[in-house]
Amino acid sequence: MQLAAIIVSLVLTVVGVALIARAIGQFVRYFRLGQPVPAGTRTDNPYQRSVTLVKEFLGHTRMNRWGIVGVAHWFVAIGFLTLPPTLAQAYGQLFEADWVLPVLGGFLPFEMYIEFIGVMTVIGIAVLMVIRLLNLPSRAGRKSRFTGSTAWQAYFVEYVILTIGLAIYVLRGLEGALHHVESYEAAYFASYPLVLAFKGLSVGVLQNLVYFVAMIKISTSLIWMITVSLNIDMGVAWHRFLAFPNIWFKREADGGTALGALQPMTSGGKPIDFTDPGDDDVFGVSQVEQFSWKGLLDFSTCTECGRCQSQCPAWNTGKPLSPKLLIMSLRDHAHAKAPYLLAGGGKTMEGEEKASEEQLA
């Protein structure tokens, strides 16, 4: 069991790391296709921007407006950030079943934190899954905020999180049994029932179970990594990474809503002088590459949650307009067009093809 678990886990790790590195490179090239923004408009006051990022993430200031959905999502988000140490623990357990993290392993506050977050992540994702199932488009039609969203991606992400959360919980129970936890204690305050359930098993069986569950945990994480790396337009997964720069680069450094006076129209990152416009100035957007890099980042960060759609008067009165579907369409078009643009393709202002036949071959 141990050898199989090691081989499967390490093979998936090599593939996953290679693909995620490639995906990061694709994102960098993709965002560079966007137009620049006026100098300093997205990078002014870096301290305040960093404060806003921490406040909006830890406080979930936007999500918590949605009640139980916001609370459940907060625990899932914190659980995702807690994944690295638990993943490191699982890798160590592939080689030594009773292995613990250096320094943190056995540190009571950390052990209690893992217990608490592990359970709350499972509860949080279960709540979100139930909410999704109760609001399926097949049940509620247009009233469902999930109408038009890519269902398989959401289900995939939800079941991955659930599987990883359960694996952490089961591993905690196995660890307690292997470490001979004889009575209820704070370090296993949530997983102690599993410690009792595994207590009568032999050391050999416990070790094989640790190898197996650690493999499940690692494999699930790496399968998720491989899947999202092959689908860089999968906003429901990639927002876990892209949301951080998206918040930091908000229009207002203090996190204020981007309302008020219309921003000056720009071309190539510079305001257009309408009294004497440049010959190559582009007014507005007629091609997806004419959006700014921040616009492309916005498209890719969309989670397809449908909250904007649920608030849209046009959508709610039976019209085809939906802000969610608009953003999704722009995202999909931008990602589909990116290879062509990166190969040198595109149109001049006169409508002529920029790339040669050799470049597009």
Regions found by a protein language model. Name each.
Residues 46, 118, 155-158, 294-304, ...:
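Secondary-structure capping and boundary motifs in well-ordered enzyme cores
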